């Protein structure tokens, strides 16, 4: 029982709401609104990794249901396209999300993995590193 409690106390549980990431294509779309209250308010997790890389994800208003001190990782950088996002647009979107959840509980990441399946996405290794460099640059500016 002692070791079980130790593990439970140190275990971090996160949820990634994935909309598909097969060879640069998605298989699901839609805003978080229909599931937000139950998912964000009742699920017993430490953080959410959420896809917000395009209009199919909807707006940030559902984040108002994130309960307690849960963290939200905003997947604002797409892994489906090699085109780099505009830095200021991403920064503006982070601040828009901060209207619903405090900035100190928000984080930035790519919307999903670069190779969520064996085939991977239509990005070169250099393009992937450029995306990660952009994440780092934006994070250093927003959370200085």
Q: Over which residues does each language-model region extend?
A:
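Aromatic-lined carbohydrate-recognition surfaces of secreted/lumenal glycan-active proteins
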Residues: 11-22
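Ligand-binding pockets and gating/stacking loops
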Residues: 27-31
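Secondary-structure boundary elements
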Residues: 7-12, 141-144
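Catalytic-face loop-and-helix region of soluble metabolic enzyme cores
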Residues: 20, 34-144
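Short, small-residue-biased leader/transition segments that mark boundaries at the very start
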Residues: 1-7
């Amino acid at each position: 029982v002692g070791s079980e409690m130790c593990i439970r106390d140190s275990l971090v549980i996160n949820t990634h709401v994935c909309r598909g990431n097969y060879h640069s294509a998605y298989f699901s779309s839609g805003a978080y609104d229909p599931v937000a209250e139950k998912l964000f308010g009742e699920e017993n997790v430490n953080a959410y990794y959420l896809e917000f890389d395009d209009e199919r994800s909807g707006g940030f208003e559902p984040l108002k249901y994130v309960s307690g001190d849960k963290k939200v990782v905003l997947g604002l950088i797409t892994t489906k396209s090699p085109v780099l996002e505009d830095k200021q647009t991403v920064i503006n979107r982070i601040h828009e999300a901060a209207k619903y959840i405090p900035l100190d509980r928000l984080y930035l990441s790519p919307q999903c993995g670069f190779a969520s399946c064996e085939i991977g996405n239509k990005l070169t290794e250099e393009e992937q590193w450029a995306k990660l460099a952009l994440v780092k640059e934006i994070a250093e500016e927003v959370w200085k």
